[in-house]
Amino acid sequence: MRCPFCGNIDTQVKDSRPAEDHVSIRRRRFCPACGGRFTTYERVQLRDLVVIKSSGKREDFDRTKLERSIRIAMQKRPIEPERIDQMISGIVRRLESLGDTDIPSKVIGEIVMESLARIDTVAYVRFASVYKNFQAADDFDKFVSELRPTAPAEE
């Protein structure tokens, strides 16, 4: 593993243990060249997923990009980081289990929205505002009004 401080490719693993999510391994590494210490995480990847964008462009699935967008939606929400990590791992497992390596971005967005809706409504609305490309306050109003349960009709 290349040292992020000096670029040396000969680093040593000093400690290795399961991460808190139990789907990855946390490794503490040491660089003998510069003395730097850093942490890496190793995860199982069942298959290489390819995202098909709405424009038709294809790009490799990037877990980090997915994680970043979810963490932005969850920012300053009272959700434990471990819960977010579990949700992200669950989304990735679900994508890998779809049986196809080519996944439309729309499918990924819908799965993320389903997961967020179960955990935090505010994060769900935040993510939806970007995913559905809200342009005005009316877009928010319409979306939020669809979330509210309707009162039963009076007879």
Curated annotation (Swiss-Prot):
Residues 49-139 form the ATP-cone domain. Its cofactor is Zn(2+). Keywords: ATP-binding, DNA-binding, Metal-binding, Nucleotide-binding, Repressor, Transcription, Transcription regulation, Zinc, Zinc-finger. One of its GO terms (biological process) is negative regulation of DNA-templated transcription. Transmembrane segments: none annotated. A zinc finger (unnamed) spans 3-34. Disulfide bonds: none annotated. Binds 1 zinc ion. It comes from the Bacteria. NCBIfam families: transcriptional regulator NrdR. Belongs to the NrdR family. Negatively regulates transcription of bacterial ribonucleotide reductase nrd genes and operons by binding to NrdR-boxes. This is Transcriptional repressor NrdR. It comes from Cereibacter sphaeroides (strain ATCC 17025 / ATH 2.4.3).
